[in-house]
Every structure is written in C-alpha cells, then in structure tokens.
A protein has these predicted regions:
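A composition/biophysics-driven feature that prefers long, compositionally simple stretches
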Residues: 1-192
C-alpha cells in the first residue's frame, strides 16, 4: 500500500521522519502481521518519555498525559483517536494533512486520565475503528502503556469473540533494526 503523495509537512513537526521511512516501517510491520496472522494492531500512549509506539507509526508523540490511540490495520490506512471535541471525526486526504501521514481518519474525544467518568471515551472510538476486525485477531502493542479501560471495554463488548495477542515483540524486532535515516537521527542526537 503506497501512500506517497507529496504533502508539505507542518512546522509543528519537530525534525519529522520522512514519509518514505514511515512507509518502510509500515511495510515491514504489515509483512510481520501477515506472517503472524494478525488483522490489526492497537496501541496507545499518553507520553513521549517511554515506548514511543504512537510516534514510531505516526511521527507524532503522545504528550502531557493526553492519550493517543492508533488502530493499524494490515490492509488499510490507520485511524487515530486523540484529544478533541465530542463527535470529532476528520477524514484525511491521501498523503495526510501535513502532520499525520498514513492515516485515513482522526476521531476525537475529551478524555482525561484524571477524570474517571471519561474512561470509556477512547475505547468507544477505538471500537468503531476496530469493528471490521471483530472475530479476527487484534495485536496489542505496548500493553504496559495501554489503559486497562481500553482493553477491558473492548473484551467485554463487541470483541468478546475476538482473539487478542501480545504484539509488542513483533514491532520491537522491526524497531530494533535501524534504517540509514534513523541511524543519522541517532548520530545527530549524540552530536548535540
């Protein structure tokens, strides 16, 4: 799935990863998903200090405690759930919006980890994006950074007959082997 359509990247991205590098990552992960018979990956981060799976897939970090959830299908573009107003649903053009690339839809909700009455907001939107995969296999990436509410809500709802597997190692083995671009970023960081 080639999503390379020239798009001007926003100045809001701090030293953005090239679209070609993102596509290399997505292709490698999708091949591993095919091998392991995983239909879709689900990941969630709420900070950029540890893990960074959201950033690895989207080039946008989760920050300041606001959760970002990524639904990464084996055969389609991503859906991202992030902080926003109730009912926020934005379809992105091919190539992205200057910030998000490889994403077909952004769903928003005003969820806060410190407000327990919002615990179901993110899972409800993730469930919308995961609906085509009910009864299939969902790979959970970085379960130690995913809220209990996310997985609990999914497993008790429409996904009760869905197979959930730990998929962090699937992604980590790909993340561990650095491309030339990633190696240059590491050198640039070390140089500072």
């Amino acid at each position: 799935m080639n999503t390379t359509i020239p798009v001007r990247l926003s100045e809001r991205l701090n030293t953005p990863i090239s679209t070609a590098e993102l596509e290399r990552r997505w292709k490698a992960v999708r091949a591993a998903m095919e091998r392991d018979k995983i239909d879709v990956l689900l990941m969630q981060n709420n900070n950029d200090h540890m893990g960074g799976y959201v950033r690895f897939f989207t080039d946008v970090p989760a920050t300041n405690g606001y959760p970002i959830t990524v639904v990464f299908p084996r055969d389609d573009l991503m859906t991202v759930v992030m902080h926003g107003g109730f009912g926020m649903a934005q379809s992105l053009p091919p190539g992205g919006n200057g910030i998000l690339r490889g994403v077909k839809k952004v769903l928003g909700t005003p969820s806060f980890a410190c407000a327990p009455y919002t615990f179901s907001y993110d899972p409800e939107l993730a469930a919308q994006a995961l609906a085509p995969y009910a009864g299939g296999t969902i790979g959970l990436v970085s379960t130690y950074q995913m809220s209990f509410a996310m997985v609990d809500n999914l497993k008790r709802g429409a996904f009760a007959n869905t197979r959930f597997v730990e998929a962090t190692d699937l992604v980590d083995t790909i993340k561990a082997i650095k491309s030339a671009e990633e190696m240059q970023r590491i050198r640039d960081s070390a140089h500072m």
